[in-house]
Amino acid sequence: YIGIKEIEIGFPSASETDYEICRELIEGGHIPDDVTIQVLVQAREHLIKKTFEAIRGAKHVILHFYNSTSTLQRKVVFHMDTDGITKIATDAADLIYEMAQPLIREGMDLRFEYSPESFMGTEMDYAVEICQAVLEHLHATPENKVILNLPTTVENCMPNQFADMLEYFCKKIPSRDSAIISLHPHNDRGCGVATAEMGLLAGAERVEATLFGNGERTGNVDIVTLAMNMYTQGIDPKLDFSNINK
């Protein structure tokens, strides 16, 4: 028992396997009452609708949606300008907010999370602009905060540069008090832990990590190393690694 209280269980709209895993966890009663599940979805209408089907019956859910915002992907993949990319995000936010209301009225604790994928490759002023637009379309308030998750994606800059970006972002976003700033560091340069630590110093409040750094390509930030490093600095990460060998 490590004590992790928010766990991403998959991408239920991406495959039938992920969908069935999500349903089994909910229907089989495998989720502790004090644990929030998180599900990932692209900012696409049919995938969002499938995701809402997958989470029915859950008690505590973070619905995490994303679209890419980098200069490269805007040009090469989407062939869109910034207005077009922002519309993808805000249309998704509108749909998610609308579909969430009946579930919230029925008692589901449902929170929202948005990631500008390839944040490192996005102009910071545009990253601020699109995230602020999403906050507004999700009706974020200081009492009902939205998680803004800032991924390193392919980690194409150094940890200190990422910290500078993050500090700038936190200072410039108008609705800072209505957002929880989250990090999602990958480890392509082998700097995932350093990036997370620098990001926390620069203003982040939350880190998405994996056990032992398991993840795509060279992995994600290792929550064990990150947490143990925090212990060495006198900070209690509120995680229990006493049985880590098992």
At which residue positions do the language-model features occur?
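Catalytic cores and adjacent flexible loops of soluble metabolic enzymes
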Residues: 1-246
